[in-house]
């Protein structure tokens, strides 16, 4: 119960307008550091002037660091500054103990052994290490990888890199709801399949894959199963044993921890082998050489500890906000489509397409709300999302998609404001759309034969 009260208090603290309370009422120096002047008349951002700081609804790209995580990191920075790999003096031992405590915290969150946790720089490195590392180690007998068309770019690019080396890759399509066809997966497995890599929660559409069923299929065929769980840990219950995963990638900054640190779960029994990407001092059981980033690792552990305590409360809070956002938009707008399954979905992700609206114009018009049109790694591209195309979404609807990311510190007031601004901008753009006028008049625009010029 105490953690619920703390989380709610921090939510109010981080979103309360500047000037309405004094610094002495902050919970910590970390909370005080987040103080922002929301009363600024306007802010110039990349040549665009907006009225004050935008609302932050891009939690799949990254989350704000939890002040309690920051406090843990700050204390560690002051007191545990030794090299965790220095085994000859107290300062090294203190730093090593801090790292091992964090390793335990991460392991508990996913029901693993601390000896199965390898700290890395983030999920991208973990994905590269898993996909390339396994296939390189077993290259003499295993030449085939299975993944899906909706994976994160770093997994897809790792697979393409393997193809250039002579490996074969099967890119499974997904159903219109974003879920994997289990029979298609079963049929794709070959005697020389060395790895199946399927993400647990999709970063763009929030779809949660049937992990236990996928893991069971892989186990039946004795094929290692890797999952990118960057969007899953701390948000949905994760159990590596129930999922039958051999490798799992994780990231701290998706769960209110620091950027620059993540982990790869590497199963010990039955043992999975992989070739390291980097060579050096042999840290992290020889799988990831280099001096560990003690304070980031401490922050990762603290974030995992908080996630264990607050996941259920967070899920209920965020679910209510998701429903508030979706209902609020649909009450005032027609032609709003949810991309991806609503039955098997992480509640903090709401990917919506707005018919008869040009996507880039909608994003630019929503400059007072920090949202995205897809993955932060590819959102600079003007091409429609490859994830939505894989779902069979029409190109025009894929172009109009907006991903709303809701999190632990999001408030009802922010959701209401986001609804207001979104509805206002969509209505404005539709007023300028001749296609929308034709639809309102009952014309089926898909059957129109447009003249060639």
Curated annotation (Swiss-Prot):
InterPro entries with a match to the protein in the record: Aminotrans_V_dom, Cys_deSase_IscS, Cysteine_dSase, PyrdxlP-dep_Trfase, PyrdxlP-dep_Trfase_major, PyrdxlP-dep_Trfase_small
Entry-linked SUPFAM superfamilies: PLP-dependent transferases (SSF53383)
Cofactor(s) listed: pyridoxal 5'-phosphate
GO biological process: [2Fe-2S] cluster assembly; iron-sulfur cluster assembly
Modified positions (N6-(pyridoxal phosphate)lysine) in chain numbering: 254
Active site (catalytic residues): 377 (cysteine persulfide intermediate)
Pfam families: Aminotran_5 (PF00266)
Listed EC numbers: 2.8.1.7
Binding site for [2Fe-2S] cluster: 377
Swiss-Prot/TrEMBL catalytic activity: (sulfur carrier)-H + L-cysteine = (sulfur carrier)-SH + L-alanine
Family under the similarity heading: Belongs to the class-V pyridoxal-phosphate-dependent aminotransferase family. NifS/IscS subfamily.
Name recorded for this polypeptide: Cysteine desulfurase, mitochondrial
Species in which this protein is naturally found: Arabidopsis thaliana
Gene: NIFS1
């Amino acid at each position: 119960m105490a953690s619920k009260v703390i989380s709610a208090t921090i939510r109010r603290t981080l979103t309360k307008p500047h000037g309405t309370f004094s610094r002495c009422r902050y919970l910590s120096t970390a909370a005080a550091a987040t103080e922002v002047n929301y009363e600024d008349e306007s802010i110039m951002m990349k040549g665009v002037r907006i009225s004050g700081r935008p609302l932050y609804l891009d939690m799949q790209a990254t989350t704000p660091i939890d002040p309690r995580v920051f406090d843990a990191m700050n204390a560690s920075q002051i007191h545990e500054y030794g090299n965790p790999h220095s085994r000859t003096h107290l300062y090294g031992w203190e730093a090593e103990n801090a790292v091992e405590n964090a390793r335990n915290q991460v392991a508990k969150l996913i029901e693993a052994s601390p000896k199965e946790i390898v700290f890395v720089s983030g999920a991208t490195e973990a994905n590269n290490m898993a996909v390339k590392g396994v296939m390189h180690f077993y290259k003499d007998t295993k030449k085939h990888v299975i993944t899906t068309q909706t994976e994160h770019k770093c997994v897809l690019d790792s697979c393409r890199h393997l193809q250039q080396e002579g490996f074969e890759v099967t890119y499974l399509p997904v159903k219109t709801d974003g879920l994997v066809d289990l029979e298609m997966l079963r049929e794709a497995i070959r005697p020389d399949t060395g790895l199946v890599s399927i993400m647990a929660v999709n970063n763009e559409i929030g779809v949660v894959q049937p992990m236990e069923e996928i893991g069971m299929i892989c186990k039946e065929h004795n094929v290692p199963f890797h999952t990118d769980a960057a969007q899953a840990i701390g948000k949905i219950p994760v159990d590596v044993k129930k999922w039958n995963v051999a490798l799992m990638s994780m990231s701290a900054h998706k769960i209110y921890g620091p950027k620059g640190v993540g982990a790869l779960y590497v199963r010990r029994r039955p043992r999975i082998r992989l070739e390291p990407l980097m060579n050096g001092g042999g840290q992290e059981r020889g799988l990831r050489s280099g001096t560990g980033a003690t304070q980031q690792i401490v922050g990762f552990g603290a974030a995992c500890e908080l996630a264990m305590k607050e996941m259920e409360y967070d899920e209920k809070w965020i679910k209510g906000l998701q429903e508030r956002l979706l209902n609020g938009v649909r009450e005032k707008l027609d032609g709003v489509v949810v991309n991806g399954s609503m039955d098997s979905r992480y509640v903090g992700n709401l990917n919506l397409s707005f018919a008869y609206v040009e996507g880039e114009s909608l994003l630019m018009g929503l400059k007072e709300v920090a949202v995205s049109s897809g993955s932060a790694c590819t959102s600079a591209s003007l091409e429609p999302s490859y994830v939505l195309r894989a779902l069979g979404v029409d190109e025009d609807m894929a172009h109009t998609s907006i991903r709303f990311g809701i999190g632990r510190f999001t408030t009802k007031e922010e959701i209401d404001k986001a609804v207001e601004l979104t509805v206002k901008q969509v209505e404005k753009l539709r007023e300028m759309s001749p296609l929308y006028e034709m639809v309102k008049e009952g014309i089926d625009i898909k059957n129109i034969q447009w003249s060639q010029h």
